[in-house]
């Protein structure tokens, strides 16, 4: 009887990279985490993915799945296990021009998607970074520059093909395996490896995009006015406020209001954006008409040894004033973290709460803090961050999985309210009762 490794070499048609081989050093780590896996598999077909999953299960090895490799907890690598790197399954195809249906491989990045769709005048509500993978972002939500108009990335998903823990290929949609389709949209990589995503794209023109900056001393009034404006602004406007950017002066850093207006009409854009310009003393304003693909930034790979401590939570309308007050105070403190306040609402909030496993539909804002540096620096900053989040805790809800640097049980509890978690457990038990897929914010099967 052949061993799992022998069967892998027989059935797997892609690259098998092991320690000591030429590509291993460049392939063993993800963007935010280093690892030393025993096998790195680069499938060239869905059959290869199935063979890789069966191998990991049969050999009893930890399994990690890598798309873009951008997860802050480092889900895209491990020590001593198997990494399935989907980078060769990166096709982007417009399969139905009339209905704007797009099929995307599980290893594609959002930069590639935007570039391929641009000549067709189409785009998909995605994230804001070119090198981020379609899979990791979509399976947890997908909050980007079109979120208020077209919803989360996962709200534009109509079907997926998934390799489950037994190596089977399963299609999930509203009509086929709807329990899995519900869970996939927000439940992360808990249920299998998505080899193909089917999205509805939307017509797009060039967009008005850029940054308007104000003095740090005006943070409180600018943030309050910004939120008030967003409550009545057209949903074509999505915006992010950055406070206390350590790379731009920390407490002295200008408040950065990033805006994206989905449309190329100058009058409509001015109607949406000019009220923000009137919120305070404008230091800089580089808003201009740009191709949508150019709104996505290049994702930088940090130097070895740099760690990121990222936390997030959602803010309901009733708590916005107090949260913004705390954010402004923290931003003015001696050594603040990077703080971002992202607008959501709009199309996101029109989806029923229980329609997907992404749970926090009623939120008006999302708050994110981030600290980066060598491990000792990040460790030293943790008590201050804990204190900040202690102040925020009574006024915020949940967490967004894509902006969490850890994956402990309390993180999972924050991402999924009890009823959502209960439903996810049932789906996990059906499709992965042995919990093969643990490289995620893990749902434990009952």
Where are these regions (language model features)?
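Soluble FAD-dependent oxygen oxidases
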Residues: 1-446
